[in-house]
Amino acid sequence: MGGSYRTLSLVIVVAAAMSSSASDAQVLMQRDVSLHMALTIAETAIAECEKSGNNVSVAVVDRAGRLRVFLQGDKAAPHNIELAQRKAYTARTFGRTSAEWAARTGPDSELAAQRQLEHVIALRGGVPIKVGGETIGAVGVSGSTSGGDEACAMAGVAKVADELK
């Protein structure tokens, strides 16, 4: 009888522990970049850069840093494909522009080792997409001047500003 009492006690303890963790379980709700939002951002960024005669590539990533949309301008150089993606990934990962991140991770910074992470790049042109303080994605532009890349990326995000409120 002592053994079955211990077994019953153990079953009750395990069941109680499982029921409390089950009651704490929730569906996780997250905001993310929709396909239409990503397309709008990318198309706007390309159009903005074309006004200055620049042929660029644009990458938009979601909250997990996964590529959501990629557009390559008609005469954009092939290396800009990778650069646009890395700029977007950098802005998403660190929740700030790739230029701000580059400034924070200079050679004399205690954060300099972050530059060794795969897929990041210390070049201007990556801009986070935010809802309040939450980063839900990012856009990267490559093929203009570095300041031009960032301005075109910002124009893309500005186009969807009302949807980000």
Locate predicted features.
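Flexible, solvent-exposed loop/hinge segments and secondary-structure transition points
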Residues: S23-K165
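Bacterial N-terminal signal peptides
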Residues: L8-S19
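N-terminal secretory signal peptides that target proteins for export/translocation
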Residues: M1-Y5
